[in-house]
């Protein structure tokens, strides 16, 4: 990921502004303005790392916001430390040498990014490992934190998952409310084929095997099996197997670590998991600061 991109820079800037990082009353009152310090970021649990590139970018954006602070700093980490690597409890993520006030003012923002992203990556890796040996691929959803979607979805990739739609413009996914308003699966598909932009893929959500048959009869390009049991997903896979045209099947709804293997064993192509980004547990990390 390009942490210097305008989109990521905007996210980081908003986080620093939200925390009033350049107006840190405590650090201003307690710390000499010229003091240098060294900060070590530590993993306090085993986890999958995501977001190490945000450290330097946060310091750069802080300097731009503050205006009076020099941006001179040094961020070092072991060559084997990179996004997607498994960290062990007590392992050093990075060491930062910088102005002491800046380190303290940016501490929470740096940790917020690293902990959330690494938490998502860690949970994603658990799901990926759980379906290992099957054809199923783990997908994310649009159930992300407001304003942080590009960050959340990058973290999913760090954990070994794949991204579904980035936003509403990224392909056609006909869901139950579209079907209800269009008057049924077939009318919804007919309108989608007629009105889609270019060659955008069209996926349709079905909740029963009867709806699956309707979608297949019309020639749906991809099908989302919503809130079906593993048994019904297996039946859906069996119905699609003899078809001359391969129709990718995705299942979603109520997918947890406890049952994801049962879904993967059905032969389904994709399993989308909202849990990855709407309810991740932040990875436990800390920053220890000492005089340089």
Predicted regions and their residues:
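Acidic/glycine-rich phosphate/pyrophosphate-binding loops and surrounding catalytic core
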Residues: 2-218, 222, 231-239, 248-250, ...
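Short, charged, intrinsically disordered terminal tails
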Residues: 275-292
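Short acidic, glycine/proline-enriched helix-loop-strand junctions
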Residues: 242-248, 290-292
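Cys/His-rich Zn2+-binding cysteine-cluster or related metal-binding knuckle/ribbon modules and their
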Residues: 257
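Short secondary-structure boundary segments
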Residues: 227, 253, 275
